[in-house]
UniProtKB/Swiss-Prot annotation:
Record-linked InterPro entries: PsdUridine_synth_cat_dom_sf (IPR020103), PsdUridine_synth_N (IPR002501), PUA-like_sf (IPR015947), PUA_sf (IPR036974), tRNA_psdUridine_synth_fam2_C (IPR015225), tRNA_psdUridine_synth_TruB (IPR014780), TruB_C (IPR032819)
Organism: Mycobacterium sp. (strain KMS)
Entry superkingdom: Bacteria
Protein's name according to its UniProt entry: tRNA pseudouridine synthase B
SUPFAM superfamilies with a match to the protein in the record: Pseudouridine synthase, PUA domain-like
Family: Belongs to the pseudouridine synthase TruB family. Type 1 subfamily.
Function: Responsible for synthesis of pseudouridine from uracil-55 in the psi GC loop of transfer RNAs.
Pfam families associated with the record: TruB_C, TruB_C_2, TruB_N
Amino acid sequence: MSGAGVGGGIVIVDKPAGMTSHDVVGRCRRIFGTRKVGHAGTLDPMATGVLVVGIDRATKLLGLLTATDKSYEATIRLGQTTTTEDAEGDVVETTPATGITDEQIGHAVAALRGEIDQVPSAVSAIKVGGQRAYKLAREGQTVELAARRVRIDRFEVLAIRRVDGFVDVDVAVDCSSGTYIRALARDVGVTLGVGGHLTLLRRTRVGRFGLDEAYPLDALADEPRLSHSLDEACLLSFPRRDLTPAEAESTRHGRALAPAGIDGVYAAAAPDGSVLALLEDGPQRTKSVVVLRPATL
């Protein structure tokens, strides 16, 4: 199946453990027969779950979809720190944690809800002096990253298990884009004085798109299919503005329109229902965020 043949769209992939997000993109290029493939929001190799993959023209949406809220299920191990703040790193320190009470864990988790200033993980993809932080960290260099304001709408303890001197805490997280779940695990451990790292991470939602519509890669290889067409993806993710024929013609040629009074980015739909562009209101005129179907197409 060629992604170009259907005008592009998005595929919700259930990423397996052990693959990088780029590996998934490579596999989808072969499955859909096009080089024009990208993803919205990197998942580490150990992580599983929702990876939004854009095919052909839908790759233009990925930067906007990356910035949407996300949901995760994770397991935090208290009593041990690692070099990467997850199970893939080397153990740095082990501290008996079985004396930590459920109430103490609950308080430490609750303290990280709401808007917080979070120091990203040292093995994040943030650039430091032109180099990715994770590359510098894995070379043994000390990486210091500035705190960033993030929003944690939900940070809930689902289960607590005490095993071999450790405490494993299953949690659910709803958060803004840019939140590092590894950093939450680290900070809970710091608060409790025993250290902590992430042992499991599964992304359950990116914006509007959840696990309930995610395909395993093997299923896509057997039967290539889009989760949503380009138009569906736009209309599910953004408010809709219906254009008149004259407005549609102006939009195709990149000309600004009168504002619609819609907050944020919205989908500008032609009379036939196809989405021509993603627009944003300015004080006097609209501005084009992404033109999906220009007059030259």
